[in-house]
């Protein structure tokens, strides 16, 4: 029994231990699976980081490569620009040397000195110049670069500094006419020497400068310098005759030429000596002279300019030309001058502008032109002959003569006073026919108005139309007597009758006739002839005369309204129309009076 119980206990303990181990194993398996999942996540993240790193490295390398390429292009453009500028400067210097007649130096191959870092000239440390009073020492330029030295040996110019180059440069004097009158002692130092003999005696040496001795004095150096400069300028003048192009001469040069041509031979020789001492062809001012065209003419060409230039440039001097062309103009065209007071231009310019000549100005030119003759005067149209009728607007005045529309003369002063002549003379038959027969019943007011009109007719108006005062025409207005009730009624009826008149009749009555109103004697005779007329007959007779009186009174005011300051041009056609209207009015007035 005891053995079986022990076996059961052992079996139970094994089962218990087995369960414990199984539980631990399951926990470990779960833990391992979680770790494996974490490891896989980490691997994916690491792979992503590696890819990002690779992309960043590629971007960085590409950016650096682009930066290097851009920097390379920038440096390349800078180098090309610098080289191009150097080449342009070299070309400018070569053109200046050619224009001055100098030989080309070390600039046969301009790329060599630029690329080798040397322009063919030694550094400044090699130049040593000492001034010991009148003694001058010269030291040749040392060449350290063999290429530059070879180029220097091949070229025909030496770069040694002599006493002419060491001496400080004089200030350049302008070739002006004002300074020719100044006394300069340097101009008169070597007049007794003949420059042609000096030029023939001295040999022309370009490679080697004249050796300077220690015992030479200052005046000898100056004379030697003058000889050297004269030799160079003579050679340059021979070359410049073919090389230098002709430059347009400005008025400053021509003015100096005019004054020099008028001087004596002694003054011309002094000018040549002064120009010979002028340092206008030093290398410091050659570039400036190249850019300024009027300063580039040499002193050898100055005498040519003096001979060919005129005495003065004729800019506003047109009198000689007009004198030369007077005969031709008189043969072709007959000109008639008009006084300035009676003739003005349409533009209404100020009268001061008339003082200027009507001829065109001539532009200044030199004798380098092919045509030395003066050109003819230009006009914008054909010359005008004022004796012929003008082609402009015309007006007709009563004298039937043509008048230009541009005259200043007042047209009212030229009018023919026809009415004054008729009024001062014997009245015509037409005026007698125009007098109307007025019935006997006219009141005394008509007689008063007739007397006033007669007085006005005896005084002819001496003033023109635009100066007539309106107060003269207002005189016939006189206060009438008080009217009775019957007269007021009759006046109302007559006013309505005036409105009923047709347009043609009222229009005829607007024009005033001088002899329509009865005179004082006619009125007295009419009143005295019928003293015993009844009121009915008077009323019946007054009716037509009242109408005529009212229209004639209104016509006096229409004269004032009809006055206009503007003058109507009177032509033959207008006069014919006026005559026809007068005839019609006479016939109409005769019919009314009948």
Curated annotation (Swiss-Prot):
Residues 38-61, 220-240 form a coiled coil. It is found in: Nucleus; Chromosome, Centromere. Residues 343-355 have a biased composition (Basic residues). GO terms for cellular component: condensed chromosome, centromeric region; nucleus. InterPro entries: Shugoshin_C, Shugoshin_N. Residues 252-261, 519-532, 539-549 have a biased composition (Polar residues). The keyword Coiled coil applies. Residues 224-239, 357-376 have a biased composition (Basic and acidic residues). Transmembrane segments: none annotated. Pfam families: Shugoshin_C, Shugoshin_N. Plays a central role in chromosome cohesion during cell division by preventing premature dissociation of cohesin complex from centromeres after prophase, when most of cohesin complex dissociates from chromosomes arms. Belongs to the shugoshin family. This is Shugoshin. It comes from Kluyveromyces lactis (strain ATCC 8585 / CBS 2359 / DSM 70799 / NBRC 1267 / NRRL Y-1140 / WM37). The gene is SGO1.
């Amino acid at each position: 029994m005891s053995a079986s119980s022990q076996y059961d206990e052992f079996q139970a303990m094994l089962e218990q231990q087995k369960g414990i181990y199984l539980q631990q194993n399951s926990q470990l398996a779960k833990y391992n699976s979680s770790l494996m999942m974490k490891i896989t996540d980490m691997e994916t993240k690491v792979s992503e980081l590696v890819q990002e790193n690779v992309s960043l490295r590629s971007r960085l390398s590409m950016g650096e490569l682009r930066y290097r390429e851009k920097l390379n292009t920038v440096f390349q453009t800078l180098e090309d620009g610098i080289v191009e500028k150097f080449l342009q400067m070299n070309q400018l210097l070569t053109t200046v040397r050619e224009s001055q007649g100098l030989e080309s130096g070390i600039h046969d191959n301009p790329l060599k000195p630029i690329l080798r870092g040397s322009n063919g000239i030694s550094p400044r440390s090699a130049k040593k110049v000492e001034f010991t009073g009148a003694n001058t020492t010269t030291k040749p330029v040392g060449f350290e670069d063999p290429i530059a030295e070879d180029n220097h040996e091949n070229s025909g110019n030496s770069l040694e500094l002599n006493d002419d180059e060491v001496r400080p440069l004089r200030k350049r004097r302008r070739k002006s006419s004002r300074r020719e009158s100044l006394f300069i002692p340097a101009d008169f130092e070597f007049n007794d020497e003949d420059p042609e003999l000096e030029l023939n005696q001295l040999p022309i040496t370009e490679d080697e400068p004249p050796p300077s001795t220690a015992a030479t004095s200052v005046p000898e150096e100056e004379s030697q310098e003058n000889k050297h400069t004269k030799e160079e300028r003579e050679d340059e003048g021979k070359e410049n005759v073919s090389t230098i192009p002709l430059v347009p001469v400005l008025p400053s040069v021509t003015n100096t030429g005019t004054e020099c041509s008028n001087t004596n031979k002694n003054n011309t020789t002094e000018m040549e000596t002064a120009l010979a001492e002028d340092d206008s062809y030093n290398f410091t001012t050659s570039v400036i002279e190249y850019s300024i065209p009027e300063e580039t003419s040499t002193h050898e060409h100055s005498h040519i300019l003096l001979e060919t230039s005129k005495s003065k440039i004729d800019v506003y001097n047109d009198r000689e030309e007009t004198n030369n062309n007077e005969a031709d103009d008189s043969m072709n065209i007959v000109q008639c001058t008009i006084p300035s007071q009676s003739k003005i231009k349409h533009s209404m310019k100020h009268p001061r502008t008339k003082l200027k000549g009507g001829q065109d100005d001539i532009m200044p030119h030199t004798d380098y032109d092919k045509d030395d003759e003066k050109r003819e005067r230009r006009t914008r149209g054909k010359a005008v002959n004022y004796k012929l009728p003008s082609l402009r607007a015309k007006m007709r005045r009563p004298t039937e003569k043509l008048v230009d529309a541009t005259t200043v003369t007042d047209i009212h002063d030229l009018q023919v006073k026809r009415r004054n002549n008729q009024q001062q003379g014997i009245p015509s038959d037409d005026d007698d026919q125009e007098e109307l027969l007025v019935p006997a019943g006219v009141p005394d007011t008509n007689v008063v108005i007739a007397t006033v009109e007669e007085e006005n007719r005896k005084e002819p108006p001496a003033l023109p139309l635009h100066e007539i005062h309106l107060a003269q025409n207002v005189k016939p207005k006189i206060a009438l007597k008080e009217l009775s009730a019957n007269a007021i009624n009759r006046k109302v009826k007559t006013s309505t009758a005036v409105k009923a008149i047709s347009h043609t009749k009222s229009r005829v009555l607007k024009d005033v006739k001088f002899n329509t109103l009865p005179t004082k004697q006619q009125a007295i005779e009419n009143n005295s002839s019928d003293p015993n007329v009844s009121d009915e007959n008077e009323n019946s007779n007054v009716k037509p005369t009242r109408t005529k009186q009212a229209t004639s009174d209104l016509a006096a005011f229409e004269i004032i309204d009809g006055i206009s300051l503007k003058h109507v041009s009177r032509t033959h056609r207008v006069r014919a129309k006026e005559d026809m209207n007068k005839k019609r009015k006479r016939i109409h007035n005769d019919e009314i009076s009948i």
